[in-house]
């Protein structure tokens, strides 16, 4: 799944409230709203976003949990898509993610505790100033797999299969 990694802040002097995007469809968030209502009633705190703190009170905010900034399933056509298809997918992700943030901060059906928490954040008004304070780049986790003499798989990542002739090395947790 893909998302935009957002630069957010709680600094009231630098925070822009989450905008309600053009093309917003509240039905996209109905399942999330019901889920959060049930979880809140049961006393369960649901992780929604991963706020990695950065300098100047800003974040690199990414997906976290089963229902978050990833617009699950809407990226499938991207790897083989032509440019108009990719542009449509990028726009769908932008509208979804902006709508998600607006919903979490404003929809009266979202439990108040969550609305207050999410509403305390906003887009940093000194970032991406030429793009409505929204990141330019969709975060593409995966799109293509190189097929050759060797195809790297989870077995390689978990050291269940070791190659005798490596050409490079990297490290990152599997997600």
State what each model feature region is.
Residues 1-175:
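Flavin (FAD/FMN)-binding glycine-rich loop and adjacent Rossmann-like elements that form
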């Amino acid at each position: 799944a893909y998302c935009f990694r957002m630069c957010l802040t709680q600094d009231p002097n630098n925070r822009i409230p989450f905008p309600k995007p053009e093309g917003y469809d509240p039905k996209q968030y109905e399942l999330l709203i019901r889920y959060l209502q049930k979880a809140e009633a049961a006393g369960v705190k649901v992780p929604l976003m991963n706020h990695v703190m950065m300098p100047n009170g800003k974040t690199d905010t990414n997906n976290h949990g089963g229902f978050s900034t990833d617009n699950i399933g809407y990226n499938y056509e991207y790897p083989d898509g032509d440019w108009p298809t990719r542009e449509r997918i990028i726009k769908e992700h932008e509208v979804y993610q902006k709508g998600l943030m607006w919903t979490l901060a404003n929809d009266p059906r979202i439990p108040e505790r969550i609305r207050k928490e999410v509403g305390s954040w906003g887009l940093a008004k000194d970032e991406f100033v030429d793009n409505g304070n929204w990141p330019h780049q969709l975060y593409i986790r995966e799109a293509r797999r190189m097929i050759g003499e060797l195809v790297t798989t989870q077995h390689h990542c978990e050291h269940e299969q070791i190659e005798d002739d490596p050409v490079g090395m990297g490290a990152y947790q599997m997600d």
